[in-house]
Amino acid sequence: MNSQTQMKQIVAEAAIEEVKSDMILGLGSGSTAVLMIKSLADAIRSGKLQNIKGVATSFQSEVLALELDIPLIDLASVSQIDLAIDGADEVDPGFQLIKGGGACHVREKLVASKANQLLIVVDETKLVRKLNQSFPLPVEVLPNAWKQVQEVISEMNGISTLRMATKKAGPVVTDQGNLILDVLFNDGIKNPKDIEKSINNIPGVLENGLFIDLTDKVLVGKIENNIPVAYSPAKVG
């Protein structure tokens, strides 16, 4: 197990300590969330946690939860979620996020907005001083609108590329049947709140991967003296 996987594993296990029996949980997507879901299944099997119900944020997390016998309920059937646990591609000091590297950010944001608490689990490589200086911002767009949206983003001084699939010909297609534009702004995103609103107001855009003022707590995995540890940084601002 390499050091990054060790960091992800320790923080995934630490996240389960935040879970109580009888909770409705938002089950995140991505590599760290996968480890968290597996740790959750272990806790349920051992009897440590009981009467847990999950709300999946993607087809990935839905399939994994079903394989591990974690009971699932549909997002539309719940009025609130006790706790959502998810990963992130970038986390800034104010706990603003970029998500969507796995093209799941639309459902992830729906679950996060319905959660009483959003817990983000990452390894320390995901902590940044400013968003979008290296990781592109995912923007989900209607298939027949991607070029038009790309032109508007260009007018906003953003460079966008249509995300292409790696194991099939053509672009990545989301769970909603849409496409993804990956956007980089010159010197990153200086005003995440404004950019989130501006992009979402472009006709043809379904949702972008900026998660603004949604995160309550961040757990970070790191290697300290050759030992993986998890810690919770303080929010700045």
From Swiss-Prot:
Amino-acid biosynthesis found in the keyword field: no
Annotated protein name in UniProt: Ribose-5-phosphate isomerase A
Record text on subunit structure and interactions: Homodimer.
Catalytic residues, chain numbering: 108 (proton acceptor)
A molecular function (GO) term: ribose-5-phosphate isomerase activity
The protein's role, per its UniProt record: Catalyzes the reversible conversion of ribose-5-phosphate to ribulose 5-phosphate.
CC annotations in GO: cytosol
GO biological process: D-ribose metabolic process; pentose-phosphate shunt, non-oxidative branch
Organism this protein belongs to: Prochlorococcus marinus (strain MIT 9312)
Keyword Magnesium among UniProt keywords: no
Gene3D superfamilies associated with the record: 3.30.70.260, 3.40.50.1360
Alphabetical list of SUPFAM superfamilies matching this protein: D-ribose-5-phosphate isomerase (RpiA), lid domain, NagB/RpiA/CoA transferase-like
Pathway per the UniProt entry: Carbohydrate degradation; pentose phosphate pathway; D-ribose 5-phosphate from D-ribulose 5-phosphate (non-oxidative stage): step 1/1
